[in-house]
Amino acid sequence: MNELNTVSTNSSDSTKNGGTSNSPDDMDSAAAASHAIKKRTKASRACDQCRKKKIKCDYKDEKGVCSNCQRNGDRCSFDRVPLKRGPSKGYTRSTSHPRTNEIQDHNNSRSYNTFDNSNNTLNNNTGNSGDNGINSNTVPSTPSRSNSVLLPPLTQYIPQAGGIPPSFQNPAIQSTMPAGNIGQQQFWKVPYHEFQHQRKGSIDSLQSDISVRTLNPNEQLSYNTVQQSPITNKHTNDSGNANGSVTGSGSASGSGGYWSFIRTSGLLAPTDDHNGEQTRRSSSIPSLLRNTSNSLLLGGQPQLPPPQQQSQPQAHQQKLQQGQNLYSYSQFSQQQPYNPSISSFGQFAANGFHSRQGSVASEAMSPSAPAMFTSTSTNPVNVAQQTQRPQGQQVPQFSSELDGNKRRQSAPVSVTLSTDRLNGNENNNGEINNNNGSNNSGSSKDTSQHSQESVTTPAALEASSPGSTPQRSTKKRRKSYVSKKTKPKRDSSISITSKDSAHPMTTSSTIAYGQISDVDLIDTYYEFIHVGFPIIPLNKTTLTSDLLLVNTQPISNIHEVNSYVILWFRNSLELLVRVALKQKPGGKFFDNIVGVALSPSNDNNKAGFTTATARDDAEKTRRDSHNEVQDTLEVQSVFIAALNECFQKIVDIHPKFRENNDQISPKIKVIYLSTFILLNYILAFVGYDNSFVLGMSVTIFNEFKLYKLLLFPEPDINDVKPPVDEEVSTGNGNTKTSEFEIGSESAGHMNPSNSPNSMDENISHYSVLFKRLYVLLSVFDSLQSCAFGGPKLLNISIQGSTERFFSNDLGSKWCLEQSQLRLKSVLQSLKLGELMSELTRNRISMNGNRKPGFDITNSSSLLSEYVETQPLSVAQLFCKLLIGKHNFINCLLSLYDSEAGVYSDLTLDLSSKIADSLCSLISIILQVLTLILRLNPTNSIDFNYRPPNPPANNPTVQEGPSAMGSSPVAGNLSAAPPSEGNPDFYKKLLGLKQDTGTILSDLCRGIISPFAIAILHEVYNITELVKQMPTSLISIMMTATTTQNTQDTKKSQDLVMKLSNSMNEVVQITSVLTMIKPFKIFEHELNKPIMSLTGGLSSTTRNDVMWPKSGQGLRESSVMKTLLDERRTSGTQPTTAPVAAEEPRLENVALENFVSIGWKLLDDSELGWY
């Protein structure tokens, strides 16, 4: 009877549920047939409406609707796909299959038929096997339910032995393999793609899931938990690529351009999966090498991209490539084909260089690291999780990923964050998105749709919630974001807007490079940086069309070195640009990237760098949660880490240069050495003392024997120009120029030389570039010596090198600048460096035989002719200031005869001489400050304040002298003191008067300079020392007028009027100093106590004792006076006793003070300006 009831019940249930799609027992019909001994007393599953409201559902098949839906007039629906249930209580494998043999046979036959049909379909479409949902080498097992869903096979992420897929000759044997071996693989730690509207399988139902096939015993535990060297896995790459098709964003190959290796990122990764990998900490190697190692790690098998999202990135990328092709010198738009070959350089890619073993610089600091202030945990579990992540996900393409991104004509640089980058951490942020969607969204959409669009920043969270207001959603989601950030399995970096970020001094932090496109970097450099100081000693056309056209494909060691060098040259240039960008109040240099959600409606922000609407809220939150000291330490920590990373990476490649010096192209050598110039420029730009970078730069320059090019006779640049446009063969059979044709195929492979450590003899027409680079390094050496008082490292004189190596013909391919007026501005900054080099080489402290008042008339005469024929610039005026300062020191120190021990008589002529020198010095200081205030008071790159384009007719050599002819007049007009009845001074200061001098000086408007902070320090030091001298001289003149005749009285009155004007200028200088803020990263206190100026006196008491009745205090605090007195006494015996001191007169007290000021000015020159 029971059997009869069971049969009747089963038949009725199967009849009832056979054609019903909304029945709750439809998903488990086969299993219910074997267990339905008694009828259910309640609904086995709540309808979607009751589940949403979280109320009890009493749905019954007889009614077809539950009471709640009937009351509300709704219809019961069961559209939501449920998750698989776990095993029941007391579940064991031995008793887990109470099914009948008939049902099992039925299911097995149905699954095999399904497999045969799919296998035939895949065999007919082998060309598109990488895009199919089920791989052809997948053997399904018995499904657990009749409505089982197809998940991507887990074995997609497990490399095969030798990359050969298993055969399917005997599927029955494979289906009967023991599935217990699968338990050895911790498959729940392997990420896989979740298809939308599909359920997850439980752990215990793995062997009944069709998404997992049984494995051969030889394939077990072949998943690499640690990234291996490309060399050890090289054999798996060739066979793997032969059988699998690459599904990525790779395009046709191209030639020309530069920095192509960055565009090769994502060649092997899925088009959607690699977007979330931007926050992964990876080895700081070129993406070209990472792609190769990734393909080897995965055994050459393609990864299955999520459906419905594959065609959009490819079409989007093709659109971007068409936009990038507008620039002839951009190789970002031309991806190279994948080459499976990898050489020994890959060992450096996977394991790092030998010099990096045990290095302080962390490998986590890489171009793929996020632009956030992060906290790197040293927990071994976290490290293991980072190493176990599959390497197929690549860094998204850089700045041009967002429509180019509609680059505005008014701004050449646009930081464009990819929307895919904002969707990073797809595996870890799904919970956050789901929670936010359920809390803030009013729609009933499945929240699993957001799992592939997870965002990591509050600004991006705001953009992902259309159902709520921006302010409210931003606030709520930031709270949820912060609450989830401490989970140990989350590898994403913590945003700087979070309140619980670690202390900056104890973390390894860096910025994410690649946010600015290559085109924008080059354009920004030549518009805002090159005119101020030529880091790259070459014009833009030759750089982009010749020098950067190098092969970076992994054909050999040399080409991989090329890729590595260009990568870190580019990163260093981007670091400079981002540090130099004008920041908002309270902003940071890495805030240009973090939390940026690009929106076309953000037109109210500054051109070039578009920020999200929540940017101000984030800044306010950060200011409220961190004090000023912590913010300063954070910025400094990130900057130092980024600078050290660039420096460490570029130094690591030097052993490869020494080993392959003969094969490395001179183009790469120029780029490599320019990177060191770039890093020294960054240090000078922010005013940071890091002598290690300069010292290592000098060492590497000496390794290349560049000093020989300056010391020994070499053909000048006029002899180098002929081979630029045509091939030249000399009559004496010398083929130095023809053996190495620029831009030819042999550029990457040079003939061997007898001296491997010296520059090759076949690069004579590149020698001018190496000479320029050596001169630039000597300039930075001199600048650091002047600023910090250290000894000069390069003692080779560069006097006259500006005219010899930089001011060449404009038509030459190797010219420095193609515009005549811009070239003159560049040469002025170089002449300033040349002067500082001569001053440091002739220091008194470094030359014991020299007297205090050493003569620099040769340098003055050399500079005077040059200064008078050039447009007005800050570098020109500062040269005049340095020369005037040394002349003033000589004048003051000559007032005291050290041998006789007496002061000179302060006559009217001597007083007039001192007053003229002092007034000229103060006038030049005011001119320097006013010009800085008008051109670029913050020394920042501001796209709303661009340099003007030079006149169209200026490049002609014939019109150059005529344009320069009026510059001395303009210089004289601007040099006139503003208080001497010159009403046009303030018009020129505000830019209202446009004469020749103003137009020429405006060519440097918006230009940044590495000398800005050093100039401001020196100007402040001189002003502090001489600001009270006019008052003292006026008092002396007023006292002396009673004993002078009428003619002398009139002359004294003129001097008093002139000194009164200087006092007025000192007041203006004090006010202008407060408006000039060129400081970046590091704050410089100009009014802090300076030992070299006051000998340990505090800033509050300095002014009180500056003019005492006796000058003993200042004289004793002079370091140089003490040093020279010791040298004098050690060389000579004391002669007669000193004369008895007389009652000091006013003139003698003033003379003592003047001499003391002279010694203090000498201390400033010898001991450093900072």
From Swiss-Prot:
It is found in: Nucleus; Cytoplasm. One of its GO terms (biological process) is negative regulation of transcription by RNA polymerase II. Residues 47-76 bind DNA. Residues 1-46, 77-149, 226-254, 269-288, 293-323, 384-506, 944-977 are annotated as: Disordered. It comes from the Eukaryota. Keywords: Activator, Cytoplasm, DNA-binding, Metal-binding, Nucleus, Phosphoprotein, Repressor, Transcription, Transcription regulation, Zinc. Disulfide bonds: none annotated. One of its GO terms (cellular component) is nucleus. Residues 99-108, 271-280 have a biased composition (Basic and acidic residues). Residues 1-22, 139-149, 411-422, 445-457, 493-506 have a biased composition (Polar residues). Residues 473-488 have a biased composition (Basic residues). Transmembrane segments: none annotated. Residues 113-138, 239-250, 293-302, 309-323, 385-397, 424-444 have a biased composition (Low complexity). CDD domains: GAL4. The keyword Transcription applies. InterPro entries: Carb_Metab_Trans_Reg, Zn2-C6_fun-type_DNA-bd_sf, Zn2Cys6_DnaBD. GO terms for molecular function: DNA binding; DNA-binding transcription activator activity, RNA polymerase II-specific; DNA-binding transcription repressor activity, RNA polymerase II-specific; RNA polymerase II cis-regulatory region sequence-specific DNA binding; zinc ion binding. Glucose-induced phosphorylation regulates the DNA-binding activity. Hyperphosphorylation in cells growing on high levels of glucose does prevents DNA-binding and dephosphorylation restores DNA-binding ability. Belongs to the EDS1/RGT1 family. Glucose-responsive transcription factor that regulates expression of several glucose transporter (HXT) genes in response to glucose. In the absence of glucose, it functions as a transcriptional repressor, whereas high concentrations of glucose cause it to function as a transcriptional activator. In cells growing on low levels of glucose, has a neutral role, neither repressing nor activating transcription. Binds the consensus binding site sequence 5'-CGGANNA-3', of which multiple copies are present in all HXT promoters regulated by RGT1. Present with 195 molecules/cell in log phase SD medium. This is Glucose transport transcription regulator RGT1. It comes from Saccharomyces cerevisiae (strain ATCC 204508 / S288c).
